[in-house]
């Protein structure tokens, strides 16, 4: 599937004609406030993906994470597959290797690396994502080596030392307590097993007292139902505590000629206009009034669709958000 951001933005408008969004934001607000009080974001994350997982499958090719292109004009789906294969190569995937995908969503990464021949097991907190992914695997005839389990990655239903390697792509940002998830990853990995993290992280340039910095990242965290974003040093320290020291770091923006991780959005002036223009906002409001779009769509779009894109691009441009760092860890051998 070709991922055309401009065309897909317009398709999304049609897609949401099928949804009742009147209560979505109020439910999200309630669950997000509850998450801030309890420190448990599982409910609000699941609520977010109850709608967004289908969007990600249909309009983003099954992956909602980003990567700098290797060259100007490279299609997003090609850049993502290149990233996924790059990670698979770093983990030395092959037959007789059992690999864990932590926060796998609907299995988009697993599909891209299935040809490496490894046994792939994914974990997602959202049951509807497991259903979508497993149905796709069955239709493709790869269910014998690709499977998604609906479970909490902080309490996984696997025996100790089950997996040879593991990766987490844009998923640890949903975990408030990295200590718990790193302990669990260390438990299910075999001694000497490698583990890759590729995620959105807060950079050292973030200033909590800077109103624009705070507004940008807080909106992203709120819209996606996430806790406060982690820094690279926090990720590394949490893994180190559980005897999984970092053994390699790679920033793909530097590797690929300083192109931004948000290139898929920001490289298109037309797309950025679509997600920022008051004209589009007004048009959507009129479509709501005429019942062409469902009630609540204007606010949903401003908060969860366009708002998220603008936060990602804005955070990247301010240098307070990074989304192109590969961190390779290795569990110490006994």
UniProtKB/Swiss-Prot annotation:
Tissue specificity field: Expressed in the pharynx and hypodermal syncytium.
One Pfam family, short name: Methyltransf_11
Pathway, per record: Steroid hormone biosynthesis; dafachronic acid biosynthesis
GO molecular function: S-adenosylmethionine-dependent methyltransferase activity; sterol 24-C-methyltransferase activity
Gene3D superfamilies the record matches: Vaccinia Virus protein VP39
Class of this enzyme: transferase
Record family assignment: Belongs to the class I-like SAM-binding methyltransferase superfamily. Erg6/SMT family.
PANTHER family xrefs: HYPOTHETICAL LOC100005854, ZGC:194242
The protein, known as: Sterol 4-C-methyltransferase strm-1
This protein's encoding gene: strm-1
């Amino acid at each position: 599937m070709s991922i055309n951001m401009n065309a897909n933005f317009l398709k999304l408008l049609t897609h949401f004609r099928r949804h009742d969004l009147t209560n979505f934001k109020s439910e999200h607000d309630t669950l997000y406030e509850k998450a801030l009080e309890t420190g448990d974001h599982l409910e609000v994350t699941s609520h977010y993906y109850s709608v967004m997982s289908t969007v990600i499958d249909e309009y983003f090719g099954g992956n909602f994470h980003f990567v700098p292109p290797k060259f100007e004009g490279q299609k997003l789906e090609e850049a993502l597959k290149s990233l996924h294969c790059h990670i698979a190569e770093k983990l030395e995937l092959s037959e007789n290797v059992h690999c864990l995908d932590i926060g796998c969503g609907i299995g988009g990464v697993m599909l891209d690396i299935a040809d490496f021949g490894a046994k792939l097991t994914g974990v997602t907190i959202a049951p509807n994502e497991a259903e979508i992914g497993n149905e796709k695997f069955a239709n493709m005839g790869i269910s014998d080596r690709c499977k998604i389990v609906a479970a909490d990655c902080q309490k996984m239903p696997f025996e100790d030392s089950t997996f040879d390697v593991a990766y987490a792509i844009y998923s640890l940002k949903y975990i408030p307590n990295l200590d718990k998830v790193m302990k669990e990853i260390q438990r299910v990995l075999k001694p000497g097993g490698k583990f890759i993290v590729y995620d959105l992280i807060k950079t050292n340039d973030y200033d909590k007292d800077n109103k624009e910095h705070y507004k940008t990242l807080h909106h992203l965290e709120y819209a996606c139902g996430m806790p406060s974003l982690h820094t690279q040093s926090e990720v590394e320290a949490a893994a180190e505590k559980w005897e999984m020291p970092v053994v390699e770091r790679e920033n793909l923006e530097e590797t690929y000629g300083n192109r931004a991780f948000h290139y898929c959005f920001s490289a298109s002036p037309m797309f950025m206009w679509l997600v920022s223009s008051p004209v589009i906002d007004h048009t959507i409001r009129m479509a709501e009034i005429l019942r062409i779009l469902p009630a609540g769509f204007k606010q949903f779009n401003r908060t969860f669709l366009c708002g998220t894109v603008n936060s990602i691009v804005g955070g990247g441009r301010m240098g307070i958000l990074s989304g192109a760092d590969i961190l390779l860890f290795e569990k110490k051998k006994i």
